[in-house]
């Protein structure tokens, strides 16, 4: 399965770094930064001294994964999503409270029926999630259910849970 991660409007450099390290651990094919997501050099559009500071902060949690992953920066996310869909990718929105499909309900048969072998996982900002103007590009919303008091997992933790499930955990549900 080919997996692309889009980090859209994620504020925290530490969340970005954690996602990059997790992405490297699961052999993600590509990272796309968009919106105000802090991106490491060479994708940063900031002044050089600020870009270096951001890159160093990301490196603290990425531990070099920012250098091992294929990555780019999208100046126009809607064009990027349109291009990816036209190229055969299906878009998954990792979101809560929009339950299309809860993660544990996705068995191997359901995944094969709903998704192609090329997927994009769209991650939104930490507080408000994915912007509603992007919903029309999303083929499937996946929710990771919570049983505690909080409404959602941290974006980097939710990403790790979903990537594990897509890479390895889905086989646990085979009958």
Each predicted region: which residue ranges?
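RNA substrate-binding interface of SAM-dependent RNA methyltransferases
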Residues: 1-96
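Residues that form or flank phosphate/diphosphate-binding pockets in enzymes
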Residues: 14-15, 101, 129, 153
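Short amphipathic alpha-helical segments
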Residues: 18-19, 45, 104-106, 133-136, ...
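Structured adenosyl-cofactor binding patch, chiefly the S-adenosyl-L-methionine
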Residues: 24, 132-175
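Short, acidic/turn-prone active-site loops that include or flank metal/cofactor-
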Residues: 36-37, 126, 146-150
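Short amphipathic alpha-helix with an adjacent loop that forms part of the alpha/beta core around
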Residues: 80-86, 104-115
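Short glycine-rich anion-binding loops that position phosphate/pyrophosphate groups of nucleotides
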Residues: 96-99, 125-128
């Amino acid at each position: 399965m080919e997996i692309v991660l889009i980090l859209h409007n994620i504020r925290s450099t530490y969340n970005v770094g954690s996602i990059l390290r997790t992405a490297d651990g699961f052999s993600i094919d590509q990272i796309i930064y968009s919106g105000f997501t802090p991106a490491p050099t060479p994708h940063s559009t900031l002044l050089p001294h600020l870009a270096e500071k951001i890159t160093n902060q990301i490196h603290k949690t990425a531990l070099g994964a920012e250098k091992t992953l294929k990555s780019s920066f999208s100046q126009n996310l809607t064009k990027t999503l349109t291009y990816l869909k036209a190229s055969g990718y299906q878009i998954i929105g990792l979101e809560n409270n929009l339950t299309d499909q809860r993660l544990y309900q996705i068995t191997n048969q359901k995944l094969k029926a709903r998704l192609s072998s090329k997927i994009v996982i769209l991650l939104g900002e930490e507080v408000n999630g994915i912007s509603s103007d992007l919903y029309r590009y999303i083929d499937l919303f996946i929710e990771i259910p919570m049983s505690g008091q909080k409404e959602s997992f941290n974006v980097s933790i939710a990403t790790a849970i979903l990537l594990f499930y897509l890479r390895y955990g889905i086989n646990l549900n085979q009958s």
